[in-house]
Regions:
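Non-catalytic DNA-recognition/assembly elements of restriction-modification systems
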Residues: 138-143, 154, 169, 320-488
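Structural motif
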Residues: 11, 197, 284, 422-427
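Signature of N6-adenine DNA methyltransferases within the class I
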Residues: 1-192, 217, 227, 233-234, ...
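Contiguous C-terminal substrate-recognition/catalytic subdomains in enzyme active sites
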Residues: 180-181, 192-244, 252
Length: 488
């Protein structure tokens, strides 16, 4: 390590990167070097100086990027490449085999196919001088001329992108919102000053979460009582900064995700956490940026900027923005947020949950489910149509008609369809909540979650008097869970 740091300080990210440079220095000018290495050097910031060395001091002649797990003997994704040890103006040949699963035999077959047929769809020719057009200079050999133009002429990303509250001890200071006394949660607070004045203990915070577009994944709270006094007194590696941004409107996403990149709208009143970075716009084109980030165009761009599973502020800030059709884009974005929020709030895990969607004025649960299913299908289909229209708009704006298609697969639409098993189980859960008084048929949202009991809220269905509900394998009690559910 000491030798590497002393002699190859700019290439110390890994032994292999220092060795590549060392091999180049040992090779005569115009000679050739070939390597089989992890492919992280092609994209990650810590290898940028290695990339620039190869661009300026050498010429990449060939490179094959293998499928993520193709080479079983390696524990990391790999590539193989060869370069001439001097810089000349010429295009290199690149094979992109990342989509072909099945091990090295499949990779071998695809390599031979590309050699015979350059129109196969995964063979590319690119001049390394073009790589510097993209911020960070990644080896984005498959970037088209139109895409490179967007980096040259596009506008700077308008948001201020940040990572937020880092407690240093999530097990102690983070909770799901329904795990604590709701009277101690600071909802509807819109600034750092209001947080302090509220005397509340818990506050909503972004936390990343599963693949979801437009709205949702809001279920986490953080203990910042007395401006985080407990964290400051007991934790060393915490980060509580940028308090001027607390509780502001923003866009958030999950920083580390093996799935597709998805963004969500954050309304005022929610803190920004470390696992859910945010971008603040201060009313400057937030809706437009949200639409772009959730489009296929952004996914294509992030393929160059963040081809690993990490979507940090640095990668997002490098996305080039081209403005057009703003009114139409903004209207579709607001519609999508509403559709996604309606879906999110239909389940108990949302703190804005009002009542169960199967609670309807129809004779049977079967009829209620049929209505709910129709609503879910309509919402799903509308959101899919809206997303495809936004894809069309951005594909046209960026001139990528020959590269991308607007269609969205059903698996990538992130509102939920009706599911009989799941929804009946959640209905039983809601019924149990009514039995214990947490919910009421006469009141939207939470009827009781601590504090003073108000019996007037339970006119239609009374909560269990002793708050004990037997669960038996047969009908032994009139007030067991089966009897109460039938009554419900």
């Amino acid at each position: 390590n000491d030798f590497i740091k002393k002699n190859y300080a700019d290439y110390k990210s890994d032994f292999f990167s220092a060795f590549v440079i060392h091999a180049s220095q040992m090779t005569k000018q115009s000679g050739y070097c070939g390597f089989f290495t992890p492919y992280v050097w092609m994209f990650i910031q810590s290898y940028e100086k290695m990339r620039n060395y190869l661009y300026n001091q050498a010429t990449i002649e060939t490179l094959i990027q293998f499928e993520y797990s193709a080479f079983e003997e390696a524990t990391v994704p790999v590539c193989t490449f060869a370069f001439q040890n001097r810089h000349v103006q010429k295009k290199g040949c690149y094979l992109r085999l990342v989509d072909f699963r099945g091990g090295m035999e499949v990779q071998r077959q695809k390599t031979l196919e590309a050699i015979k047929n350059h129109d196969c769809g995964f063979y590319y020719e690119q001049n390394t001088d073009n790589f510097s057009i993209i911020p960070g200079s990644p080896v984005a050999y498959w970037a088209s001329t139109k895409m490179l133009e967007s980096f040259q002429t596009g506008n700077k990303f308008a948001g201020e992108t940040k990572k937020g509250v880092l407690t240093g001890d999530n097990n102690t200071y983070l909770r799901l919102w329904h795990e604590v006394n709701i009277g101690k949660i600071g909802f509807e607070l819109y600034s750092h000053a209001e947080m302090i004045d509220s005397s509340m203990k818990w506050f909503p915070v972004t936390s990343g979460g599963e693949k979801r577009r437009w709205y949702g994944n809001f279920d986490t709270i953080v203990n910042l009582e007395n401006d985080g006094a407990d964290i400051k007194a007991n934790v060393k590696n915490y980060r509580l900064r940028d308090s001027q941004y607390y509780m502001l409107e923003a866009i958030t996403w999950t920083e580390i995700s093996s799935s597709i990149f998805t963004c969500r709208y954050v309304p005022k009143g929610i803190l920004f956490g470390n696992g859910g970075p945010v971008s603040f716009f201060f009313n400057k084109k937030l809706m437009y940026h949200l639409a772009l980030l959730n489009s296929k165009v952004a996914m294509e761009i992030l393929g160059y900027l963040a081809p690993t599973i990490n979507y940090g502020p640095e990668q997002i800030n490098r996305i080039p923005i081209v403005y057009s059709n703003e009114d139409e884009v903004n209207q579709l974005t607001k519609w999508n947020i509403l559709l996604s929020q309606t879906d999110w709030d239909s389940f108990e895990t949302s703190w804005d949950f009002q009542h169960h969607p199967l609670l309807r004025k129809v004779p049977t649960i079967a009829e209620a489910f049929d209505q709910w299913q129709a609503e879910c299908d309509d919402r799903f289909n509308q959101l899919k149509a809206n997303e495809e229209e936004l894809n069309r708009i951005f594909i046209d704006i960026y001139g990528l008609q020959d590269e991308l298609i607007p269609e969205v697969e059903d698996k990538d639409v992130t509102v939920r369809k009706a599911d009989l098993g799941r929804d009946i189980r959640s209905f039983i859960s809601y019924a149990v909540g009514c039995m214990f008084g947490r919910y009421s048929l006469d009141v939207d949202g939470l009827a009781y979650a601590g504090g003073e009991w108000d019996a007037s809220k339970y006119a239609s269905f009374a909560a269990d008097k002793d708050n004990i509900i037997p669960i038996c394998d047969d009908e032994y009690f009139e007030d067991d869970i089966v009897g109460l559910f039938v009554e419900f």
